[in-house]
A protein has these predicted regions:
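Class I S-adenosyl-L-methionine
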Residues: 1-11, 16-113, 118, 218, ...
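Class I SAM-dependent methyltransferase SAM-binding "motif I" and its flanking Rossmann-like core
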Residues: 10, 86-160, 205, 290
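Surface-exposed, charge/polar-rich loops and edge strands
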Residues: 187, 245-304
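A contiguous loop/helix-start segment that scaffolds small-molecule binding in enzyme catalytic cores
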Residues: 1-3, 74-79, 140-258, 263-265
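Short gly/pro/ser/thr-enriched loop/turn and capping motifs at secondary-structure boundaries
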Residues: 36-37, 55-57, 114-118, 135-138, ...
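A polyampholytic, Gly/Pro-enriched intrinsically disordered region
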Residues: 71-73, 126-138, 209-221, 295-303
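Short hydrophobic/aromatic-enriched beta-strand-loop microsegments
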Residues: 46-53, 104-108, 127-137, 184-193, ...
């Protein structure tokens, strides 16, 4: 079993090792946040199992997912558990690894680029900067609901760290911001929410800790998004780059044959476009071994 980090969103940000694992997989057990275009790296006959979890809508319980991974491996299959971001950064990869260990199933961890760093980067927000931020912390915005109380030490967290990055925190934003302000973080502290970071549909909302809740409602910003708090947010004014691309925000339908589409798609994506491949033609060898083509070429002189 390979517990593979799919990266922060853009399918091309998966690691080389992650791509190699997909290429040899017999079974891919996939998360909601893992881009489906990654399946292009897999074999044609790969078994694809979706186990994604959205807020209030879970395809499968975590306990069942972990056991499914182990069961598929026990069938003698090469299994890739494809998880958004990094498996060990709020990805529950550790829990899955524990179950595999209990079932005597060999596994490897293939780290991925976390959205905690990549999403702010694509918004032009570095999580550290020598002049304004020498520390950062990554915090879950959605703790285990079965716990009796929060494990987050808000009193220390609010002021001890320069940059705070909350994952999965849109739904709990009122609680997060109120706790930060309560324990000493200024309501005027710059903040930003980055939705679908690194993807063509990326949205960036720049706000403050005090105004974040109201601004999210005003702009109807939905999950998934990372919430960044700190003076580094101001650097976006200078180093914003991704959403400045000429085709950013454009959806482009590519109708070329499958084998011809990839180069054009890549070029358009490099310019910021979101490409949808829908091949309208298929190039194949004719059934008559080119006899009809040869006949037409022989008569080419008759055409005006």
């Amino acid at each position: 079993v390979y517990l593979v980090g799919a990266g922060p969103g853009d399918y091309r940000l998966i690691t080389l090792k992650g791509k190699e694992c997909l290429e040899k997989a017999d079974v891919v057990i996939c998360d909601y946040l893992a881009d489906k275009r990654l399946m292009a790296f897999a074999k044609d006959d790969v078994e694809y199992i979706y186990v994604g979890k959205k807020a209030g809508n879970h395809a499968m319980r975590q306990e069942d997912i972990s056991q499914l991974i182990a069961d598929k491996a026990k069938e003698g299959k090469c299994v890739v558990r494809l998880k958004g971001g990094d498996p060990f950064v709020f990805g529950r990869g550790g829990e899955e690894a524990e179950v595999l260990k209990k079932n005597n199933v060999a596994f490897e961890i293939v780290p991925g680029i976390s959205s905690a760093i990549a999403a702010p980067a694509y918004a032009g927000i570095p999580v550290t900067n020598r002049k304004v931020a020498v520390s950062f912390a990554v915090i879950t915005g959605h703790e285990d609901p079965t716990k009796g109380k929060s494990d987050i030490n808000w009193e220390k967290l609010a002021t001890a760290v320069d940059t705070l990055v909350f994952l999965m925190g849109v739904g709990n934003l009122p609680h997060i911001t109120s706790q930060l302000i309560k324990y000493g973080r200024s309501a005027d502290t710059p903040a930003a929410l980055v939705r679908w970071g690194t993807k063509a549909e990326q949205e960036v909302l720049v706000t403050t800790v005090g105004n974040a809740v109201e601004d999210v409602k005003k702009h109807n910003l939905k999950p998934p998004a990372v919430f960044v708090v700190g003076n580094v947010v101001n650097l976006r004014q200078t180093i914003q780059w991704f959403d400045n691309k000429p085709l950013f925000g454009k959806n482009i339908l590519v109708t070329r044959a499958r084998e011809q589409a990839s180069k054009l798609t890549t070029a358009l994506e490099d310019l910021g476009a979101n490409c949808i491949e829908a091949p309208a033609i298929k190039i194949t060898t004719p059934d008559d071994d080119f006899a009809s083509l040869d006949k037409a070429i022989a008569k080419i002189g008759e055409y005006e």
